[in-house]
């Protein structure tokens, strides 16, 4: 939970949209429920309530996040490059660089889950964009 709170706190402090703050909070919600495809799981939950761009960022963040650690595990850290040229490539790389990969700091002062409740309620009370 702390990683997600840090990610969302960083997004909020950088004046991200309410939608992106909620996406930052929930981007890893699938870690325990769907460890083999956690990003796709999180994107599926958010998809009816967020833009195509936000859905894509959440869905692909796992691949983009590999840039920071995959080479230590014998994998290709540049796997994300297969999406170069995609209109959301830069936004996804930025999401990972500024908020996701830097949110493992045990000394970071995160907001609480309660602080994000109004954002979550706002986004999930929208009329769904899609089903």
Enumerate the language-model features and the residues they cover:
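Divalent metal-dependent phosphate-bond-processing catalytic cores, especially two-metal-ion Mg2+/Mn2+ enzymes
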Residues: 1-5, 9-17, 48-56, 60-131
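His-Asp-centered metal-binding catalytic motifs of divalent-metal-dependent phosphohydrolases/nucleases
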Residues: 10-42, 58-62
């Amino acid at each position: 939970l702390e990683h997600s709170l840090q990610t969302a706190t960083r997004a909020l402090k950088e004046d991200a949209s309410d939608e992106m703050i909620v996406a930052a909070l929930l981007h890893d919600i699938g870690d325990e429920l769907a460890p083999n495809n956690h990003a796709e799981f999180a994107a599926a939950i958010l998809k009816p309530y967020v833009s195509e761009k936000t859905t894509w960022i959440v869905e692909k963040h796992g691949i983009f996040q590999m840039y920071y650690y995959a080479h230590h595990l014998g994998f290709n850290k540049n796997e994300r490059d297969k999406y170069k040229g995609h209109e959301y490539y830069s936004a996804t790389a930025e999401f990972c660089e500024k908020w996701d990969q830097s949110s493992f700091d045990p000394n970071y002062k995160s907001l609480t889950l309660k602080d994000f409740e109004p954002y979550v309620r706002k986004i999930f009370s929208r009329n769904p964009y899609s089903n």
